[in-house]
Amino acid sequence: MIDQNLLRTNLDDVANALKVKRGFTLDVESVKALEEKRKALQVKTETLQAERNARSKNIGAAKARGEDISALLAEVDNMGNELNEAKVALDQVQAEIRELLLSVPNLPADEVPLGKDDTENLEVSRWGEPRQFDFEVKDHVALGEALNGLDFAAGVKLTASRFVVMKGKLARLHRALSQFMLDLHTEQHGYVETNVPFLVNHDTLFGTGQLPKFGEDLFHTQPLTGQDPNETQRPFSLIPTAEVPVTNLVRDEIIDEDSLPLRYTAHTPCFRSEAGSYGRDTRGLIRMHQFEKVEMVQIVAPEKSMEALEELTGHAEKVLQLLGLPYRKVLLCTGDMGFGSAKTYDLEVWLPAQNTYREISSCSNMWDFQARRMSARCKAKGDKKTRLVHTLNGSGLAVGRTLVAVLENYQNADGSITVPEVLRPYMGGVEVITA
Protein backbone atom coordinates (compact mmCIF):
# COMPACT_ATOMS: atom_id res chain seq x y z
CA MET A 1 0.00 0.00 0.00
CA ILE A 2 1.44 3.36 -0.98
CA ASP A 3 1.86 6.18 1.53
CA GLN A 4 -1.36 8.13 2.01
CA ASN A 5 0.70 11.26 2.67
CA LEU A 6 1.91 11.13 -0.95
CA LEU A 7 -1.67 11.59 -2.09
CA ARG A 8 -2.17 14.46 0.33
CA THR A 9 0.95 16.37 -0.69
CA ASN A 10 1.66 15.32 -4.30
CA LEU A 11 -1.62 13.98 -5.65
CA ASP A 12 -1.28 15.18 -9.24
CA ASP A 13 2.36 14.05 -9.52
CA VAL A 14 1.54 10.62 -8.09
CA ALA A 15 -1.47 10.23 -10.39
CA ASN A 16 0.66 11.15 -13.41
CA ALA A 17 3.45 8.74 -12.40
CA LEU A 18 0.94 5.91 -11.93
CA LYS A 19 -0.58 6.62 -15.34
CA VAL A 20 2.73 6.87 -17.21
CA LYS A 21 4.66 4.12 -15.42
CA ARG A 22 1.95 1.67 -14.40
CA GLY A 23 -0.90 2.33 -16.81
CA PHE A 24 -3.05 2.84 -13.71
CA THR A 25 -5.67 5.59 -13.68
CA LEU A 26 -6.12 7.05 -10.22
CA ASP A 27 -9.53 8.64 -9.63
CA VAL A 28 -8.13 12.02 -8.60
CA GLU A 29 -11.51 13.66 -8.07
CA SER A 30 -12.64 10.89 -5.72
CA VAL A 31 -9.38 11.15 -3.79
CA LYS A 32 -9.77 14.92 -3.46
CA ALA A 33 -13.40 14.64 -2.35
CA LEU A 34 -12.59 11.99 0.25
CA GLU A 35 -9.61 13.96 1.52
CA GLU A 36 -11.68 17.16 1.90
CA LYS A 37 -14.34 15.19 3.74
CA ARG A 38 -11.70 13.63 5.98
CA LYS A 39 -10.18 17.01 6.83
CA ALA A 40 -13.56 18.51 7.71
CA LEU A 41 -14.50 15.57 9.92
CA GLN A 42 -11.05 15.57 11.53
CA VAL A 43 -11.44 19.26 12.45
CA LYS A 44 -15.00 18.70 13.66
CA THR A 45 -13.96 15.74 15.81
CA GLU A 46 -11.04 17.57 17.38
CA THR A 47 -13.14 20.70 18.01
CA LEU A 48 -15.96 18.73 19.64
CA GLN A 49 -13.46 16.81 21.76
CA ALA A 50 -11.86 20.04 22.98
CA GLU A 51 -15.22 21.66 23.72
CA ARG A 52 -16.46 18.58 25.54
CA ASN A 53 -13.32 18.49 27.68
CA ALA A 54 -13.78 22.18 28.53
CA ARG A 55 -17.44 21.66 29.45
CA SER A 56 -16.51 18.70 31.63
CA LYS A 57 -14.08 20.89 33.57
CA ASN A 58 -16.83 23.50 34.02
CA ILE A 59 -19.07 20.83 35.51
CA GLY A 60 -16.47 20.04 38.14
CA ALA A 61 -16.06 23.71 39.03
CA ALA A 62 -19.83 24.34 39.16
CA LYS A 63 -20.35 21.28 41.32
CA ALA A 64 -17.69 22.51 43.74
CA ARG A 65 -19.59 25.80 44.02
CA GLY A 66 -22.78 23.93 44.80
CA GLU A 67 -24.54 24.99 41.59
CA ASP A 68 -27.14 23.00 39.66
CA ILE A 69 -25.21 21.09 36.99
CA SER A 70 -28.08 19.21 35.32
CA ALA A 71 -28.13 21.53 32.30
CA LEU A 72 -24.37 21.26 31.90
CA LEU A 73 -24.56 17.46 32.13
CA ALA A 74 -27.23 17.36 29.43
CA GLU A 75 -25.11 19.64 27.24
CA VAL A 76 -22.05 17.40 27.66
CA ASP A 77 -24.12 14.30 26.92
CA ASN A 78 -25.47 15.83 23.72
CA MET A 79 -21.99 16.91 22.73
CA GLY A 80 -20.76 13.37 23.42
CA ASN A 81 -23.39 11.95 21.08
CA GLU A 82 -22.41 14.43 18.39
CA LEU A 83 -18.74 13.56 18.92
CA ASN A 84 -19.44 9.84 18.57
CA GLU A 85 -21.34 10.44 15.33
CA ALA A 86 -18.44 12.49 13.98
CA LYS A 87 -15.97 9.76 14.93
CA VAL A 88 -18.06 7.11 13.16
CA ALA A 89 -18.27 9.30 10.06
CA LEU A 90 -14.50 9.91 10.18
CA ASP A 91 -13.79 6.20 10.52
CA GLN A 92 -16.04 5.50 7.55
CA VAL A 93 -14.26 8.04 5.34
CA GLN A 94 -10.85 6.74 6.39
CA ALA A 95 -12.02 3.22 5.55
CA GLU A 96 -13.09 4.44 2.09
CA ILE A 97 -9.68 6.04 1.56
CA ARG A 98 -7.96 2.85 2.68
CA GLU A 99 -10.11 0.77 0.31
CA LEU A 100 -9.12 3.06 -2.54
CA LEU A 101 -5.44 2.83 -1.63
CA LEU A 102 -5.58 -0.98 -1.70
CA SER A 103 -6.16 -0.88 -5.46
CA VAL A 104 -3.16 1.37 -6.15
CA PRO A 105 0.09 -0.36 -7.25
CA ASN A 106 3.50 0.57 -5.91
CA LEU A 107 5.44 3.35 -7.60
CA PRO A 108 8.47 2.01 -9.52
CA ALA A 109 11.98 3.14 -8.68
CA ASP A 110 13.38 5.85 -10.96
CA GLU A 111 15.81 3.47 -12.69
CA VAL A 112 13.09 1.03 -13.75
CA PRO A 113 12.67 1.26 -17.56
CA LEU A 114 9.33 2.32 -18.99
CA GLY A 115 7.56 -0.37 -20.97
CA LYS A 116 4.22 -2.00 -21.62
CA ASP A 117 5.10 -5.70 -21.23
CA ASP A 118 7.91 -8.27 -21.06
CA THR A 119 9.09 -7.43 -24.58
CA GLU A 120 10.46 -4.16 -23.19
CA ASN A 121 12.38 -5.62 -20.24
CA LEU A 122 16.07 -4.72 -20.10
CA GLU A 123 18.69 -7.46 -20.25
CA VAL A 124 21.39 -6.67 -17.69
CA SER A 125 23.82 -9.56 -18.08
CA ARG A 126 24.35 -13.17 -19.14
CA TRP A 127 26.26 -16.00 -17.51
CA GLY A 128 27.41 -19.22 -19.14
CA GLU A 129 27.31 -20.40 -22.73
CA PRO A 130 24.43 -22.58 -23.94
CA ARG A 131 25.65 -26.08 -24.67
CA GLN A 132 26.00 -27.13 -28.30
CA PHE A 133 24.50 -30.61 -28.74
CA ASP A 134 25.59 -33.09 -31.41
CA PHE A 135 22.31 -34.99 -31.17
CA GLU A 136 18.61 -34.15 -31.31
CA VAL A 137 17.61 -32.43 -28.07
CA LYS A 138 14.61 -33.79 -26.16
CA ASP A 139 12.45 -31.74 -23.83
CA HIS A 140 12.13 -32.53 -20.13
CA VAL A 141 8.80 -34.29 -20.59
CA ALA A 142 10.19 -36.81 -23.06
CA LEU A 143 13.30 -37.28 -20.95
CA GLY A 144 11.42 -37.65 -17.66
CA GLU A 145 8.83 -40.07 -19.01
CA ALA A 146 11.48 -42.24 -20.67
CA LEU A 147 13.29 -42.43 -17.33
CA ASN A 148 10.00 -43.43 -15.61
CA GLY A 149 10.43 -40.40 -13.38
CA LEU A 150 7.65 -38.03 -14.50
CA ASP A 151 4.08 -39.34 -14.62
CA PHE A 152 1.66 -36.65 -15.78
CA ALA A 153 -1.15 -39.15 -16.40
CA ALA A 154 -1.05 -40.14 -12.74
CA GLY A 155 -1.27 -36.46 -11.78
CA VAL A 156 -4.41 -36.10 -13.89
CA LYS A 157 -5.90 -39.27 -12.39
CA LEU A 158 -5.22 -38.18 -8.82
CA THR A 159 -6.21 -34.54 -9.24
CA ALA A 160 -6.36 -32.80 -12.64
CA SER A 161 -4.15 -31.36 -15.35
CA ARG A 162 -1.13 -29.30 -14.26
CA PHE A 163 -0.26 -31.85 -11.58
CA VAL A 164 2.47 -34.49 -11.74
CA VAL A 165 3.76 -37.53 -9.88
CA MET A 166 7.55 -37.82 -9.64
CA LYS A 167 9.15 -41.20 -9.05
CA GLY A 168 12.46 -42.86 -8.37
CA LYS A 169 15.68 -41.08 -9.15
CA LEU A 170 13.97 -37.98 -10.55
CA ALA A 171 12.00 -37.59 -7.32
CA ARG A 172 15.31 -37.85 -5.50
CA LEU A 173 16.93 -35.34 -7.87
CA HIS A 174 14.06 -32.93 -7.20
CA ARG A 175 14.61 -33.36 -3.45
CA ALA A 176 18.37 -32.98 -3.88
CA LEU A 177 17.89 -29.64 -5.59
CA SER A 178 15.85 -28.22 -2.72
CA GLN A 179 18.30 -29.50 -0.11
CA PHE A 180 21.24 -28.05 -2.04
CA MET A 181 19.52 -24.65 -2.26
CA LEU A 182 18.67 -24.58 1.44
CA ASP A 183 22.19 -25.57 2.44
CA LEU A 184 23.71 -22.91 0.20
CA HIS A 185 21.49 -20.12 1.54
CA THR A 186 21.84 -21.08 5.20
CA GLU A 187 25.52 -22.00 5.23
CA GLN A 188 26.96 -19.43 2.82
CA HIS A 189 24.43 -16.63 2.44
CA GLY A 190 23.39 -16.10 6.05
CA TYR A 191 19.70 -17.02 5.90
CA VAL A 192 17.77 -18.62 8.75
CA GLU A 193 15.80 -21.66 7.62
CA THR A 194 12.12 -21.49 8.54
CA ASN A 195 9.37 -24.08 8.37
CA VAL A 196 6.06 -22.27 7.96
CA PRO A 197 2.36 -23.17 7.55
CA PHE A 198 1.14 -23.86 4.02
CA LEU A 199 -2.36 -22.66 4.98
CA VAL A 200 -2.69 -18.99 5.94
CA ASN A 201 -5.44 -16.61 7.00
CA HIS A 202 -6.81 -13.48 5.36
CA ASP A 203 -4.61 -11.08 7.34
CA THR A 204 -1.46 -12.85 6.16
CA LEU A 205 -2.48 -12.69 2.50
CA PHE A 206 -3.49 -9.07 2.93
CA GLY A 207 -0.13 -8.21 4.47
CA THR A 208 1.90 -9.22 1.43
CA GLY A 209 -0.61 -7.88 -1.09
CA GLN A 210 -2.31 -11.02 -2.44
CA LEU A 211 -5.64 -9.82 -1.07
CA PRO A 212 -7.93 -8.24 -1.92
CA LYS A 213 -6.74 -7.86 -5.52
CA PHE A 214 -5.52 -11.36 -6.42
CA GLY A 215 -7.94 -13.67 -4.63
CA GLU A 216 -8.83 -15.52 -7.84
CA ASP A 217 -5.21 -16.65 -8.21
CA LEU A 218 -5.38 -18.57 -4.92
CA PHE A 219 -6.80 -21.89 -3.76
CA HIS A 220 -9.16 -21.36 -0.81
CA THR A 221 -10.48 -23.93 1.63
CA GLN A 222 -14.24 -24.18 1.81
CA PRO A 223 -15.96 -22.34 4.67
CA LEU A 224 -16.66 -24.82 7.42
CA THR A 225 -20.17 -26.01 8.18
CA GLY A 226 -20.42 -24.76 11.73
CA GLN A 227 -22.20 -27.93 12.80
CA ASP A 228 -19.23 -29.14 14.80
CA PRO A 229 -18.68 -26.89 17.87
CA ASN A 230 -14.95 -27.62 17.67
CA GLU A 231 -14.66 -26.23 14.14
CA THR A 232 -13.17 -22.82 13.53
CA GLN A 233 -15.36 -20.64 11.32
CA ARG A 234 -12.45 -19.06 9.49
CA PRO A 235 -11.51 -20.42 6.04
CA PHE A 236 -7.86 -20.50 5.03
CA SER A 237 -5.96 -20.33 1.75
CA LEU A 238 -3.05 -22.35 0.38
CA ILE A 239 0.09 -20.26 -0.01
CA PRO A 240 1.06 -19.18 -3.56
CA THR A 241 4.65 -18.68 -2.36
CA ALA A 242 6.58 -18.88 0.92
CA GLU A 243 7.00 -15.11 0.64
CA VAL A 244 3.52 -14.84 2.15
CA PRO A 245 4.00 -16.56 5.53
CA VAL A 246 7.71 -15.77 5.87
CA THR A 247 7.37 -12.02 5.28
CA ASN A 248 4.42 -11.89 7.68
CA LEU A 249 6.64 -13.11 10.50
CA VAL A 250 7.37 -9.41 11.14
CA ARG A 251 3.74 -8.28 10.95
CA ASP A 252 2.81 -5.96 13.85
CA GLU A 253 6.40 -6.09 15.11
CA ILE A 254 8.80 -3.31 16.09
CA ILE A 255 12.30 -4.55 15.27
CA ASP A 256 15.50 -3.26 16.81
CA GLU A 257 17.43 -1.74 13.89
CA ASP A 258 20.62 -3.27 15.24
CA SER A 259 19.16 -6.71 14.45
CA LEU A 260 18.60 -5.85 10.78
CA PRO A 261 18.85 -7.23 8.20
CA LEU A 262 16.74 -10.30 8.87
CA ARG A 263 17.26 -13.04 6.29
CA TYR A 264 14.88 -15.99 6.09
CA THR A 265 14.63 -18.91 3.70
CA ALA A 266 11.99 -21.62 3.38
CA HIS A 267 11.29 -24.61 1.16
CA THR A 268 7.55 -25.02 0.61
CA PRO A 269 5.02 -26.24 -1.88
CA CYS A 270 3.24 -23.40 -3.69
CA PHE A 271 -0.32 -23.49 -4.97
CA ARG A 272 -1.64 -21.29 -7.77
CA SER A 273 -4.88 -21.45 -9.71
CA GLU A 274 -3.13 -19.89 -12.75
CA ALA A 275 -6.24 -17.85 -13.51
CA GLY A 276 -5.78 -16.19 -16.88
CA SER A 277 -3.14 -18.71 -17.99
CA TYR A 278 -5.44 -21.02 -19.93
CA GLY A 279 -3.59 -22.57 -22.86
CA ARG A 280 -0.14 -21.37 -21.76
CA ASP A 281 2.66 -23.87 -21.01
CA THR A 282 0.25 -26.80 -20.93
CA ARG A 283 3.07 -29.31 -21.47
CA GLY A 284 5.39 -30.27 -18.65
CA LEU A 285 6.50 -28.71 -15.39
CA ILE A 286 6.77 -25.05 -16.35
CA ARG A 287 3.33 -23.94 -15.15
CA MET A 288 1.80 -26.16 -12.46
CA HIS A 289 -0.98 -25.72 -9.92
CA GLN A 290 1.34 -27.21 -7.29
CA PHE A 291 5.11 -26.78 -7.33
CA GLU A 292 7.96 -26.34 -4.87
CA LYS A 293 10.18 -23.36 -4.34
CA VAL A 294 12.99 -22.26 -2.06
CA GLU A 295 12.22 -18.67 -1.12
CA MET A 296 14.48 -15.96 0.25
CA VAL A 297 13.10 -13.02 2.26
CA GLN A 298 14.98 -10.04 3.65
CA ILE A 299 13.74 -7.41 6.10
CA VAL A 300 16.00 -4.36 6.01
CA ALA A 301 16.36 -0.71 7.00
CA PRO A 302 14.91 1.55 4.26
CA GLU A 303 18.24 3.00 3.15
CA LYS A 304 19.66 -0.50 2.66
CA SER A 305 16.99 -2.03 0.43
CA MET A 306 18.47 -1.34 -3.00
CA GLU A 307 21.81 -2.76 -1.90
CA ALA A 308 19.93 -5.74 -0.44
CA LEU A 309 18.17 -6.37 -3.77
CA GLU A 310 21.51 -6.73 -5.54
CA GLU A 311 22.70 -9.08 -2.79
CA LEU A 312 19.56 -11.22 -2.80
CA THR A 313 19.58 -11.50 -6.60
CA GLY A 314 23.23 -12.53 -6.41
CA HIS A 315 22.28 -15.31 -4.00
CA ALA A 316 19.79 -16.69 -6.55
CA GLU A 317 22.39 -16.36 -9.30
CA LYS A 318 24.87 -18.38 -7.24
CA VAL A 319 22.53 -21.39 -7.32
CA LEU A 320 22.48 -21.32 -11.11
CA GLN A 321 26.23 -20.81 -11.34
CA LEU A 322 27.03 -23.75 -9.07
CA LEU A 323 24.66 -25.91 -11.09
CA GLY A 324 26.37 -24.77 -14.29
CA LEU A 325 23.13 -23.56 -15.86
CA PRO A 326 23.38 -20.68 -18.38
CA TYR A 327 21.07 -17.78 -17.55
CA ARG A 328 20.43 -14.13 -18.12
CA LYS A 329 19.51 -11.37 -15.67
CA VAL A 330 16.67 -9.06 -16.72
CA LEU A 331 15.43 -5.81 -15.18
CA LEU A 332 11.65 -5.76 -15.51
CA CYS A 333 10.03 -2.74 -17.12
CA THR A 334 7.15 -0.87 -15.50
CA GLY A 335 4.53 -2.82 -17.45
CA ASP A 336 5.80 -6.25 -16.38
CA MET A 337 6.40 -5.64 -12.67
CA GLY A 338 4.36 -7.13 -9.87
CA PHE A 339 1.65 -5.07 -8.18
CA GLY A 340 3.67 -4.37 -5.02
CA SER A 341 7.18 -4.19 -6.43
CA ALA A 342 9.36 -1.09 -6.72
CA LYS A 343 12.10 -2.91 -8.66
CA THR A 344 12.38 -6.49 -9.89
CA TYR A 345 15.06 -8.61 -11.50
CA ASP A 346 14.12 -11.85 -13.24
CA LEU A 347 16.64 -14.62 -13.76
CA GLU A 348 15.90 -16.64 -16.88
CA VAL A 349 17.54 -20.03 -17.38
CA TRP A 350 18.43 -21.48 -20.79
CA LEU A 351 16.17 -24.33 -21.91
CA PRO A 352 17.67 -26.11 -24.95
CA ALA A 353 14.42 -27.77 -26.05
CA GLN A 354 12.70 -24.38 -26.25
CA ASN A 355 15.84 -22.66 -27.55
CA THR A 356 15.14 -19.74 -25.24
CA TYR A 357 15.51 -18.38 -21.72
CA ARG A 358 12.65 -18.93 -19.26
CA GLU A 359 12.03 -17.33 -15.87
CA ILE A 360 13.36 -19.36 -12.93
CA SER A 361 13.61 -16.65 -10.28
CA SER A 362 12.04 -13.27 -9.59
CA CYS A 363 13.74 -10.99 -7.03
CA SER A 364 11.91 -7.88 -5.84
CA ASN A 365 12.35 -4.87 -3.61
CA MET A 366 8.91 -3.94 -2.28
CA TRP A 367 10.11 -0.81 -0.43
CA ASP A 368 7.58 -0.15 2.38
CA PHE A 369 4.56 -1.30 0.34
CA GLN A 370 4.09 -4.54 2.30
CA ALA A 371 5.39 -3.15 5.58
CA ARG A 372 2.66 -0.49 5.62
CA ARG A 373 0.00 -3.17 5.22
CA MET A 374 1.65 -5.32 7.91
CA SER A 375 2.57 -2.47 10.29
CA ALA A 376 6.12 -3.84 10.31
CA ARG A 377 8.42 -1.25 11.81
CA CYS A 378 11.92 -0.75 13.13
CA LYS A 379 13.42 1.59 15.70
CA ALA A 380 16.98 2.66 16.39
CA LYS A 381 18.28 2.80 19.95
CA GLY A 382 17.51 6.13 21.55
CA ASP A 383 14.85 7.04 18.99
CA LYS A 384 11.27 7.54 20.09
CA LYS A 385 9.83 7.24 16.60
CA THR A 386 9.54 4.07 14.57
CA ARG A 387 9.73 3.77 10.79
CA LEU A 388 8.53 1.19 8.33
CA VAL A 389 11.00 -1.49 7.27
CA HIS A 390 11.58 -2.44 3.65
CA THR A 391 10.85 -6.00 2.53
CA LEU A 392 12.45 -8.03 -0.26
CA ASN A 393 11.80 -11.49 -1.63
CA GLY A 394 13.16 -13.78 -4.30
CA SER A 395 13.08 -17.35 -5.54
CA GLY A 396 16.22 -19.21 -4.78
CA LEU A 397 15.05 -21.12 -6.87
CA ALA A 398 11.81 -22.58 -8.24
CA VAL A 399 12.65 -26.27 -7.76
CA GLY A 400 10.51 -27.74 -10.55
CA ARG A 401 11.82 -25.33 -13.17
CA THR A 402 15.37 -26.00 -11.98
CA LEU A 403 14.72 -29.71 -12.49
CA VAL A 404 13.54 -28.90 -16.02
CA ALA A 405 16.76 -26.99 -16.69
CA VAL A 406 18.97 -29.76 -15.29
CA LEU A 407 17.22 -32.46 -17.33
CA GLU A 408 17.47 -30.54 -20.58
CA ASN A 409 20.97 -29.09 -20.16
CA TYR A 410 22.54 -32.28 -18.78
CA GLN A 411 20.88 -34.80 -21.12
CA ASN A 412 22.92 -37.34 -23.04
CA ALA A 413 22.36 -38.90 -26.46
CA ASP A 414 21.05 -42.14 -24.90
CA GLY A 415 18.44 -40.25 -22.82
CA SER A 416 20.38 -40.50 -19.57
CA ILE A 417 21.03 -37.45 -17.37
CA THR A 418 24.42 -36.49 -15.99
CA VAL A 419 24.00 -35.33 -12.38
CA PRO A 420 25.65 -31.92 -11.75
CA GLU A 421 28.66 -32.34 -9.47
CA VAL A 422 27.26 -30.19 -6.64
CA LEU A 423 24.21 -32.46 -6.42
CA ARG A 424 26.03 -35.78 -6.27
CA PRO A 425 26.53 -35.75 -2.47
CA TYR A 426 22.72 -35.39 -2.18
CA MET A 427 22.22 -38.27 -4.63
CA GLY A 428 24.29 -40.86 -2.78
CA GLY A 429 27.13 -40.39 -5.24
CA VAL A 430 25.04 -41.16 -8.34
CA GLU A 431 26.69 -39.56 -11.37
CA VAL A 432 24.30 -40.55 -14.15
CA ILE A 433 20.55 -41.21 -14.06
CA THR A 434 19.40 -43.97 -16.38
CA ALA A 435 16.12 -45.78 -16.92
Curated annotation (Swiss-Prot):
Entry's EC annotation: 6.1.1.11
Keywords of this entry: Aminoacyl-tRNA synthetase, ATP-binding, Cytoplasm, Ligase, Nucleotide-binding, Protein biosynthesis
Superkingdom as given in the UniProt entry: Bacteria
Residue positions binding L-serine: 241-243, 295, 395
InterPro entries membership: aa-tRNA-synt_IIb, aa-tRNA-synth_II, aa-tRNA-synth_II/BPL/LPL, Ser-tRNA-ligase_type_1, Ser-tRNA-synth_1_N, SerRS_1_N_sf, SerRS_core, tRNA-bd_arm
GO cellular component, one term: cytoplasm
Biological process terms in GO annotation: selenocysteine biosynthetic process; seryl-tRNA aminoacylation
Cellular localisation: Cytoplasm
Pathway: Aminoacyl-tRNA biosynthesis; selenocysteinyl-tRNA(Sec) biosynthesis; L-seryl-tRNA(Sec) from L-serine and tRNA(Sec): step 1/1
Single GO molecular function: ATP binding
Gene3D superfamilies: Bira Bifunctional Protein, Domain 2, Serine-tRNA synthetase, tRNA binding domain
Primary location group: cytoplasm
Annotated positions binding ATP: 272-274, 359-362
Subunit text: Homodimer. The tRNA molecule binds across the dimer.
Comment block on domains: Consists of two distinct domains, a catalytic core and a N-terminal extension that is involved in tRNA binding.
Family to which the UniProt record says this protein belongs: Belongs to the class-II aminoacyl-tRNA synthetase family. Type-1 seryl-tRNA synthetase subfamily.
Its job: Catalyzes the attachment of serine to tRNA(Ser). Is also able to aminoacylate tRNA(Sec) with serine, to form the misacylated tRNA L-seryl-tRNA(Sec), which will be further converted into selenocysteinyl-tRNA(Sec).
Protein name: Serine--tRNA ligase
The organism of origin for this protein: Actinobacillus pleuropneumoniae serotype 3 (strain JL03)
Lineage of the organism: Bacteria, Pseudomonadati, Pseudomonadota, Gammaproteobacteria, Pasteurellales
